[in-house]
A protein has these predicted regions:
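Catalytic phosphate/nucleotide-handling subdomain of diverse soluble enzymes
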Residues: 1-11, 67, 71-134
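Accessory "access/gating" subregions that flank catalytic or transport cores
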Residues: 10-93
Length: 134
C-alpha cells in the first residue's frame, strides 16, 4: 500500500494538484486499505518542525516500508524543490536510494522536468553509453 501511495502522489502531482500529500489524505482518509498510510502521513506531518536527520533516524533509515516512505514524506514536506529535497535525503544517510528515487519522481512530477538541475543531468551517463561499454 505504501508503494501504491507513491504512485497516487505522483499521479496527483502530474494532474496539477498543488499539494498532492494533502489531496491524498483528503481522498483516502475513509479508505480502510490506506488507513495506516494516512495515519503515518499525519504522524510525519507532526514531525515537520524536527530536523530531517533526527526524523529519519526515528522514522526509519532502511529501505523497508513504512520507514522509507515516512522518511521520504518528511523530506518532501520540508523541501520546496527537487535539489533541496535530494540533497537533504542523501545527507540523512541510510538507504537513501530508496527514498531519493521517489522524492525525485515526486518533485519532477510536481514542478516539471526543469526542476532537475541541468548540471546534474550533464554529469549523468546515459544507460545506452553504460551498456555499450561491455
Amino acid at each position: 500500500k505504501y508503494a501504491l501511495t507513491k504512485f497516487h502522489l505522483i499521479d496527483l502531482a502530474l494532474k496539477g494538484s498543488k499539494n498532492p500529500i494533502n489531496e491524498f489524505i483528503k481522498q483516502f482518509k475513509k479508505d480502510s486499505y490506506f488507513k495506516s498510510v494516512v495515519d503515518d502521513i499525519k504522524k510525519v506531518k507532526r514531525l515537520k518542525s524536527k530536523s530531517h536527520l533526527k526524523s529519519v533516524k526515528k522514522l526509519g533509515m532502511a529501505c523497508s516500508y513504512p520507514g522509507t516512505f515516512n522518511s521520504s514524506i518528511h523530506s518532501i514536506i520540508n523541501s520546496t524543490n527537487y535539489k533541496g529535497a535530494i540533497l537533504k535525503t542523501i545527507k540523512a544517510g541510510g538507504c537513501n536510494c530508496s527514498r531519493v528515487n521517489f522524492i525525485g519522481a515526486y518533485f519532477a512530477a510536481l514542478k516539471g522536468i526543469n526542476t532537475i538541475p541541468k548540471s546534474w543531468i550533464r554529469k549523468t551517463d546515459s544507460a545506452k553509453k553504460i551498456l555499450d561499454q561491455n
